[in-house]
Amino acid sequence: MSEKSRTLADLPIGQSGYVRIVNGDGCRRRRIIDMGITPGTEIKIIKAAPMGDPIEIAMRGYSLSLRREDAQRIELLTDGEAKELREKAVLSARNLELKAKGSLTHSADEDAPYHRRAAMITEIMLKGRCKPGSCSGCREEGVCPICEKNGTQEGHDGKEKVRLALVGNPNSGKTTLFNAMTGSREYVGNWPGVTVEKKEGKVKDTGLYTYGHDMTLVDLPGIYSLSPYSMEEIVARKYITVEKPDAIINIVDATNLERNLYLTVQLMELERPMIIALNMMDEVEKRGDEIDVHKLSLELGVPVVPISARSGQGVEKLINGIQGVINAAHAEFHEGFNIEPDDIYNGYTHALHHQIGDLVGKYAEQAGLPLHWAEMKLMEGDGETIKELALPEDVQQRVDKIVKEYSDSAPLGDSESMIADARYKYVTRVCAASLRRGHPIDQLTTSDKIDRVLTNKYLALPIFIGIMLLIFALTFGTVGAWLSELVSIFMDDVLTPYVRAALENAGAMEWLTSLICDGIITGVGGVLTFLPQIAILFFFLSILDDSGYMSRIAFIMDKPMRRFGLSGKSFIPLLMGFGCTVPAAMGTRTMENEKDKRMTILLLPFMSCSAKLPVYGLMAGAFFAKGRALVILSLYLIGIIVGILSGYLFRKTIFKDNDAAFMIELPTYRLPAAKNVFTHVWERVSHFIEKAGTIIFAMSVVLWFLQSFDLSFNMVQSAETSILGRLGSFIAPVFSPMGYGCWQAAVALLTGIIAKEAVVSSLAMFCGFSLSAGGGAVQSALSGIFTPRSAYAFLVFVLLYTPCMAAVATIRRELGSRKWTAFAVCYQILIAYVMSFIVYTVCGLFMV
């Protein structure tokens, strides 16, 4: 292969190359370009995953992983060719600019009052000169751009309702800032897709910073660009363009400035009032770097506030600065806080932009879209914008012809590449003017050194397996088992006797005493016994997530998962499925490919969620006390294996010819914030408690009633003759081939569809045992309906069959189809039945 035709996939590890062009078409190519891989970009190969694919590359100050097949799309130049190409591009651009109508250039420092105004707002905020009752900014600058008062700030009469949109890249600290500004507690993670729905919260009114405004902050999904290729981008873009918030808060990771400002430039094109929250400035200082915030604000024409969302530093100044943005919008909205496109685009882009603008101006106005935004999106061939503009056929044909002519003659590729390249060139100039690095860009950081170990070719998989084994041992072994035992003793030896005695002394009727003690406390208390294990599991998962290790897991696992029809991106929601299927299913929205998303959702229920832990703990403790941890671990492994094999089956049948691009940013390793970790744990634990206090409580009452009364509503002496017993007896024969063809097991599985924890409370009531009595007593109570062999087969069925109703509802919403949801439920029941039968049969060779 000649040097000119070599691709990024041919580049050896440790070497750099320059991009000639990104081949291909469609969303896959667009995603590669949006991530910063444009003609002339320098890219360095850092390493390959332990199995050789994907690879990690470094460019524009950040790291990205992509598959070798995608790297083969990227043709490279030598350094000399790249320089020559740039010179030709500049010359050609100047020639084209002469043909364009009028001059389209001006400086950010000349004839741009909103640039100077933005910089002035930034300076006032940084120095804290604008405060209620004492605005020295007013006296020094004339009319203060923050409070618009001469002298004392008196605030507004009444509360003006303001809606703010919080927008930023994944891993930029967006959700942490949302929590800091609103006091809301929300899951904070370090992988794409944590915030998958629009969330709202009231900005905290300190009395000093909101100036009479009633501010609502909308936390939009984390996105890398405004291209409509993922559900995240569609939701964020639609909210900004259709619902038009009063102002945008663009959170930018200061440690990854160039990458984050690409989205900033796109947001400026939307012509909405905006302020930049420059996050993680404390980390910038630790690195020895320096960002001139005033210069950055002047270059962009947008107010900039340095903050640290984790510590809360600068957050009040940010809220204060929002007032300036809103007032500026009222005062001079036409100019707004946008940079004119001629500040960013030149040459080819300017000429193309100018011609398209003359054609589509009135249609953009009718559609309620900013003209510059519409022009840029038409140049990119954006399908959503084309639909929104609804151009007449002749106008659309003229636009297509203009774009094609420029694309065919452009030295940097097509119009898509030109637009992305122009944005990144502008961002590079802004960074050069405002960022001073205290160390060489290629110098190894602490994060790089950690990554060399955790993603090492030989150490990555053993370390990952070791971490997971340690988590399981602590959760289900020593610490988790001991804490669960303490809760169990309290429920059965302290609470139940006390309540029973109190009711009897009060002369309560026998049925009421039975309802409270044998129904509610036994049912709800039995589930709460496993609360410590769930808390420990989420504690460790949160640490892995918040530290940045989750993205490395996807990087490591992409190739082995592809062999079974899955993607490395699938691994993240599948791993979160071990916690709860509901947020895991929602997390698939970050997957651009619809088939990948559907297949991942179909496989999620096979990942054993935390709600099944009480069932595992009960049965494993009773029948496999000495090997309890190994039995539970084997169930998790069975779920993983079934998921992998199902994925392979789906890829060969209903999801044929589906191969989405795998591109994921590898964020800097960070020490997990204790507040974030414990907030996450509390949210999951409180959700579990809420479930126990509502669903499990109601189920316990209903089950007690159905167990205690017959069809004539007379109390029964034996649960077998009760309403529930008769229902269970009717369906029990279905489970006879697996060894648990009794009414108690059948009914427990039915209640498990409502909530998996209900299986424990059902068995406890039906079999009449107390969890605090110890494994021997529980085994004695269960031995009438289970043997070790059938108990293990029962656990396999619980592992694989239909998830709880909340999960089914979420799956229905995410799949957007009743047909696919019905298929998922039926497939899971079928697989559970077949696997349970196989396990029961195979175990017959070793146990009774």
Across the structure, where does each feature detected by a protein language model lie?
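Conserved G1/Walker A P-loop phosphate-binding module
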Residues: 124-225
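Juxtamembrane inter-helical linkers in multi-pass membrane proteins
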Residues: 489-497, 551-581, 656-680, 724-726, ...
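Alpha-helical transmembrane helix bundles of large polytopic membrane transport and channel proteins
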Residues: 275, 285-438
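Core alpha-helical transmembrane segments of integral membrane proteins
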Residues: 454-555
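Transmembrane helix-loop junctions at the membrane interface of multipass transporters and ion channels
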Residues: 606, 610-633, 806-817, 838-848
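Conserved C-terminal guanine-recognition region of P-loop GTPase G domains, centered on the G4
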Residues: 204, 208-209, 235-304, 615
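Short, membrane-interfacial amphipathic segments enriched in basic
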Residues: 432-447, 502-513, 664-679, 716-724
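Extended, low-charge hydrophobic alpha-helical regions
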Residues: 406-407, 414, 418, 478-520, ...
